[in-house]
Every structure is written in structure tokens, then in C-alpha cells.
């Protein structure tokens, strides 16, 4: 019986986005600023909706959940990267890597399904306004060239053939992504048909404008996901993968509260009341 030389991996090294010290300092400040903006922006959305009884409706319920998920999403990846920079280490344990990867996939899926439910909410509100309340009440319903443990760079570390793993991930990802995306598409097809029947141009514009924020978030979310996970590996570089991943793990959660509150008069009013209440209490 011949012996074989085997070794086990106990930790990985996260190489980050740059190895240049000057760039690392700049990236640290940039990601710290974006992370704080993400947490504060989404936290304000959650507080505004939870403390204002006028916003206790299905649309704002889903929005507050999306803000909470976005806050958790950024907290899964960015703090570890910032901590590694402060501590001067690039290591992440094997169990820590798997845990981070698990929560990234969990929160991406939650974002995915929340966007689909929000599209259905807009569909019911526009196409079936008289049944909206009845339908939407809760009574009826090694070295990783990356800055977090993403599955694509992790599979590249394997010494064995990973084609089957990649096929399974692509198939499962397609099923998870396609089902909500089809719901979103169907909702907006019905919305478009209903809006086009509105006689006045102003009425059509007002109806479409209620969906603008959601469409912007859907475009950002699905655009970056498709760019990262549904392109052939040979056609893109690790750097492009990393930058696309930064978009959906850091930039999109940061932009969501601004996108949703920018054109929403009720939400802006609730935010002003939250800020003024906190200011006077201090």
C-alpha cells in the first residue's frame, strides 16, 4: 500500500482589490464611506417606515425589508475587508469563508425574491386597485483574488475538475434568478398594458413614475448579477469579475435608499420627521 502526500486547507488569503499601499489607503476610505452611507441610508429608511403609521402599507413593508437585507448584505462582506486592512492581515478561516459565502448567497436570494414581490405589489396596485388591500394584506399572504468569499474565485482554487460544480451553480442560479425575473417581467407587461389604456398622457406618466424606482433597482441588481455569474469564465478577467461584484454587494445596497426616497414624497416626509425627532431628543 503506497502512501500519498495530502494536505488540508485551514484558511484562505483574501488578496483584496489592490496590492499597492497608496491604493489600499484610498480604497479603505472609499469603502468605509460607502459602507457607512449604506448602513445609515438603509437604517433611516427602516426607521422612517417603522415609526410612521401612514407608511404601514405593503409597499413600504417590502421596502423596509429590502433596506434591512441590503444593510445585512453589505455587512457580510465589507467589514471583513476593512478589518483586514486595519489589522494588516489577509487571512480568513475555512469556516469563516464558508459562512461568509453562505450569507452572501442567502441575502442575494432574499433580495431577488423581494424585488419580485415588489413588482407584483406594483402590478396589483396599478392593474387591480380595487382589490389591492384585500390581496396584499398579511392576513392573506488558499489565496482568493477577491475581497470576500465568492464562489467563482473559490472554485478556481480547486485542483480537481470543477465543471460539474459550475454547471450545478449555473443551473441552480438560473432557476432561482429566472423565476422571480419572470414574475417581474409579467408584472410589468400587465402594468404597461394597463397604463397604455389610460387616456391622458399625464395619467400614463404618473402611473409609470410610481415604478421608476423599482425598475432602477431591478436593472442594477440583475445587470450586475448577469455580468458576474452568467458570462463564460474565459471571456472575462478576475478584475472585471471583482468590479462587477463590488457593484451588487456594495454600490447597489448603498444606492437603493436614495433611489427609493428621491421621488417618494411620503417617504421623504417620514425621513424628515425621523431626523427632526432624533435631533430634538438630543
Where on the chain are the PLM-derived regions?
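Transmembrane helical core of 7TM receptor-like proteins
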Residues: 1-282
